[in-house]
Amino acid sequence: MKIFITGSSGFIGLHLSQKLLNNGHIVHGFDSMNNYYDVKLKKSRYQILKNFKKFSFTKGKVENQKILNKSILRFKPKVIIHLAAQAGVRYSIKKPRTYIDSNIIGTYNIIESAKKSKVKHLLIASSSSVYGANKNIPFKEVDKADTQLSIYAATKKSTESLAHSYSSLWKLPITILRFFTVYGPWGRPDMAYFKFTKKILARKKIDIYNKGKMYRDYTYIDDIVDGINKLLNKTPSLYQKKKIKNDSLSPVAPFRILNIGNTRKVYLLDFINTLEKMIGLKAKKNYMPMQKGDVKMTLSNTSLLKKITGYNPKTNYQKGIKLFLKWYMQYYKIKKIKI
């Protein structure tokens, strides 16, 4: 099957592209390779994908409708997976316009191109951050999501609404993927676990917000990719015969929202403690107040995804951290830790 992936040189994009290529699919990647974080890391990811015969690539921004549309219409995919986005909750407070352009305009362009090319299924990456100040734990797809706390979260929720409108008007099958704190090898350097690792190794202080009184649903990259892969052929339909309890399927469109998470809460200090033990160094901790735009807790309910696909996350955070550290030490050529 021909699959078009935006953000192919990103963290999730790399792992997903590899999985699909190994499964025999034909993948066309699309990425701007911007400098929000280390471009060298993005290029290294691209070099891995470049070795696959069934992989092709276009460099471009999703905000550029002309390049994007040309690339999609030429490739003629059956499925589009839209992962490209300007990430980062804190950066969105400083540079909101960047998020409007990349996340909202970029997603609009993707949906327009998907409509023109008549794809069978469009999957759009969203985020657990859209749940915002929601107090219903664990988060279910049918919960209200009207209290976003950051510009990043607001742009993600906006794209969900835009996608639903298009799906309703043109009967375009769309699945929204709400990811929960993704981590693992080849991850993003702006993510907390990545920063913690770098600073612990450098014997520098790590900033811990809200005095560590928060938890996350840390989801290992392989589980995220497994969830997406299982959904490729699970196209939402207005004519679904069997009703599913707490289904987020729209009553007026072939549109569904799905959480992809680990379903286990991990307290921040426990995560840091595991990092310390595996690295063999104690972190120097700098306790800080809660940051603007951040949330104290995230936890997914993935019952709907399990009913539809049989999804069952396999990697606990201890194993996930171990796998991440193994990659980190190899990639950054850290041979020995001196205590």
Task: List the model feature ranges, each with a label.
Residues 1-182, 315, 319-322, 326-331, ...:
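N-terminal Rossmann-like NAD(P)+-binding domain of SDR-like oxidoreductases, especially those catalyzing
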Residues 15, 40-41, 70, 94, ...:
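Generic recognition of short, well-ordered alpha-helical segments
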Residues 19, 60, 200-339:
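C-terminal substrate-binding subdomain of Rossmann-fold SDR/epimerase-dehydratase oxidoreductases
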Residues 39, 43-46, 160, 194, ...:
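Short, surface-exposed alpha-helical segments at coil->helix boundaries
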Residues 67, 98, 105, 144, ...:
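Residue-level recognition of oxygen-bearing side chains
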Residues 137-138, 189-197:
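A glycine/serine/threonine-rich, flexible loop-to-helix segment
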Residues 158, 162, 166, 196, ...:
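Hydrophobic alpha-helix immediately C-terminal to the catalytic Tyr-X-X-X-Lys motif of short-chain
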Residues 181, 185, 214-216:
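Heptad-repeat alpha-helical coiled-coil signaling segments
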